Each structure stands twice: as C-alpha cells, then as structure tokens.
Design a protein with these regions (language model features):
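Residues at the starts of beta-strands that form the adenosine-phosphate
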Residues: 151-152, 178-182, 258
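C-terminal functional extensions of proteins
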Residues: 184-186, 190, 199-286
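Short, basic, glycine/proline-bearing loop/turn elements
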Residues: 127-129, 154-156, 209-217
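Conserved catalytic alpha/beta core of Sir2/sirtuin-type deacylases, generalized to analogous enzyme cores
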Residues: 111-130, 135-136, 186-195, 201-206, ...
Length: 286
C-alpha cells in the first residue's frame, strides 16, 4: 500500500512514542527526531510504500538509541493482561460458539490496546459490546469453505496481547483438521509478536511457529527470508491479521491464493482503500 498525506502525522507520532520508550535522554531524542525529519523529507513521497517507510523509520530509532526492542515492556504486559482475561472470554464465546464469533474475537483482539488496560478494567463489557456489532464485510461462508477444502493454513499474526485471543480462533480452525503454520516477526518492531511472545502466549499448542525473516512493519515482500518465501508460496490458504499485513500483502499478486483479512479499520487511509467506515470490523477475501 502507498502512503497518503495522513500517514505523515502517524509516522511522527510513532517516532515520538518509540523515542520515549527507548531513552530518557532528551538531547538524543532531539538529534534522532532531526534525522527522522530528514529521512521523511527524502522518502515520504507520493508512491512510497507505507510499510517500508515505517520500518526504516523505526530501525533508525533503534540504531541511534541502541534500544533494539522499545516496546518490550508493553508487549509482556499486553500478553499477561490478555491471558488473565482469556478464561472470561472463553465463557462469553461458549454462549455462542459460531465460527463468526471466533472470528469476531480475533478481530476484537486487534481492536483492544491491552497495554492500556489494567486488571481492574471492565474488559468483559468491551468484549460483549463488540461481539454485538456486525462485521461490515463478512465473507464467513467463503471462509468456512476454505477451512473445509484445504488441509493447511498459514496464519500471519499481528500484535502481542492480540495473539492471546488468536488462540481461540486457532483452536476452532484445528477442529477442521488443518495443519496450521503461525508466522511471527524475526526482529522486534512496534508491539508486533516475535517468537518469544508467541511462545509465551502458548501459540505453539496449535501449530508450528515460523519467523518471516525480518522485523518490518507489517509484511514487506522484498525483505522476507528465502525460507519464509518458500513457506508462503507453498500455502494457498492464508489468514492475515491486522492492518500492517493488509498493507503489505495487497502489494503483491494473490490471484492464486485464498487470502482472508481479519482486521479493524483503525486508519482513515485503509478504511477508504477498502471502502468501509472507520472502526468497522472486517473479514474479507482478497
């Protein structure tokens, strides 16, 4: 996906956030922010790839501050809080164990910022109210048909915290008898899930966890490893979580694949690209 004018303020917000998490040295923050402005001045242009631009910016922060995983604390806390609520979520979904509700739970995980919740927050209320919302795009019948007609699936996860709720959908997928391969980032980027995060959340219970070979914002086809490219090419059925993976996968030819995107349209650029409203929950085939 290409950048829009709205991506500019978002990049700067992310840069400030990453800097605040990386260092307390205000002088260093200023120096790095100056370099980020120079980088964006040279690279933030019409036709630029959004994921590649964001990845390079975050790597600049890591390189200059020496902090390779600025979001580590937030990632650990996100998983811990989500795991704490998982039994309650299971009870909620037991009231209606339709495939659509499992999909909704996985998308709700994408909506919730687990790092912003405490153990006293009424997350159960948030989940129940979200489950009552309809999916704006709901290719659920095609999705179930793919579950029934394929023998394996590649599942591209997104953030920590969110991956805990993915466990429920992964368990549901296992009921269809599919072999599941779960793809995570090889290096830290934002609060995206890496191998250690996926193992901490228990995703290895559902299938083999593989690394994509890079630490990019979302999916960047030019940077994945040869090993992961072979895995990707050998899977016809792919489930993609979150906006970053949508931005990257829509840059490549998917005509010979069954790719389903599960996400909440939290960004104006992406909501317009898909043709939905901001904050809509979506399951759609591309």
């Amino acid at each position: 996906m290409k950048v829009s004018y709205e991506c500019g303020p978002c990049f700067l917000r992310q840069a400030r956030e990453a800097l605040d998490l990386s260092t307390d040295d205000d002088e260093l923050k200023m120096d790095v922010m100056e370099e980020i402005f120079k980088f964006l001045s040279d690279n933030f242009k019409l036709g630029a790839n959004s994921n590649s631009t964001g990845s390079a910016m975050h790597n600049l922060v890591k390189q200059k501050t020496g902090c390779i995983d600025p979001y580590r604390k937030e990632k650990i806390e996100g998983n811990e809080i989500a795991l704490k609520y998982l039994p309650d979520v299971k009870k909620i979904i037991d009231e209606d164990d339709s495939l659509e509700n499992y999909v909704k739970i996985a998308i709700i995980g994408n909506i919730l910022d687990f790092g912003a919740f405490t153990l006293d927050d009424d997350i159960e209320r948030v989940i129940k109210s979200s489950l009552k919302k309809d999916l704006t795009i709901k290719d659920i019948d095609e999705f179930e048909n793919s579950l029934k007609t394929n023998d394996k699936v590649l599942y591209l996860v997104d953030n920590t915290g969110e991956i805990v709720f993915d466990k429920l959908l992964l368990a549901k997928i296992k009921e269809y008898g599919l072999d599941i391969t779960i793809a995570v980032k090889s290096e830290p980027i934002l609060n995206d899930a890496c191998m250690v995060d996926a193992l901490d959340a228990g995703l290895d219970e559902f299938g083999e966890i593989v690394e994509i070979g890079c630490g990019t914002v979302g999916y960047v086809d030019s940077q994945i490893s040869d090993e992961f490219r072979e895995i990707f090419n050998n899977h016809k059925f792919i489930i993609s979580k979150g906006m970053g993976n949508y931005e990257g996968l829509t840059e490549i030819d998917l005509s010979n694949k069954e790719v389903y995107f599960l996400l909440c349209a939290k960004c104006g650029t992406i909501s317009r690209d898909i043709g939905v409203n901001l904050h809509d929950m979506l399951l759609f085939k591309k």
